[in-house]
């Protein structure tokens, strides 16, 4: 449990640094916008990622792009981007990204794996991720986070790095408000069936 606590603290610090960098990049992009051509597969997407069929549609698009059976290491849904880390052979992992308003995912891109644990310990079957839970989890996480004006910005499903034997992958919902330095956030976790685990 001590290892889990320190891991969560380090993950929180890492996420804070990442979001601060993203906020800075977004500010710079607003100051110096660069016109880009409209991709052929682009369309206007107006639905909320966490209250619609967008997660299922995104995973279906990634399935088509992979073109064969695979297991998942991580699924991450955010309003602007869906990320899937997949393994077709149980030995290597590839990343697929699907941007909001696009029909075709980008990928595969190889993922550099670190650590000594067997890859198989971090992979799960596609059916383990019950995407029907996402709207309910998103609503519940906002309530549990208790951040005034907070909203869900990402939902992910993966095994925790530090876990007990036999534990299932975990849903992690990020709730936040504002941008650094005026920024509040919390991670709310649930087991594979949607039972609340923790908020930090």
Residues covered by each model-derived region:
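Hydrophobic single-pass membrane-insertion segments
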Residues: 2-15
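Long, charged/polar, surface-exposed segments that mediate recognition or autoinhibition
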Residues: 107-153
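Extracytoplasmic low-complexity, Pro/Thr/Ser/Ala/Gly-rich segments
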Residues: 12-85, 89
């Amino acid at each position: 449990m001590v290892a889990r606590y320190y891991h969560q603290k380090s993950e929180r610090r890492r996420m804070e640094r990442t979001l601060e960098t993203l906020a800075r990049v977004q500010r710079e992009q607003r100051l110096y916008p660069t016109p880009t051509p409209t991709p052929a597969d682009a369309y206007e997407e107006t639905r909320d990622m966490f209250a619609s069929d967008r997660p299922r549609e995104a995973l279906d698009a990634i399935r088509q792009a992979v073109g064969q059976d695979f297991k998942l290491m991580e699924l991450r849904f955010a309003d602007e981007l869906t990320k899937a880390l997949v393994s077709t052979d149980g030995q290597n992992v590839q990343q697929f990204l699907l941007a909001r308003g696009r029909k075709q995912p980008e990928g595969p891109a190889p993922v550099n794996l670190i650590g000594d644990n067997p890859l198989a310990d971090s992979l799960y079957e596609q059916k383990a991720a019950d995407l029907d839970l996402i709207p309910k989890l998103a609503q519940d996480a906002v309530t549990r986070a208790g951040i005034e004006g907070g909203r869900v910005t990402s939902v992910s499903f993966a095994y925790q790095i530090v876990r007990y034997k036999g534990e299932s992958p975990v849903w992690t919902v990020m709730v936040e408000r504002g941008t650094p330095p005026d920024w509040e956030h919390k991670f709310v976790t649930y087991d594979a069936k949607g039972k609340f685990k923790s908020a930090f």
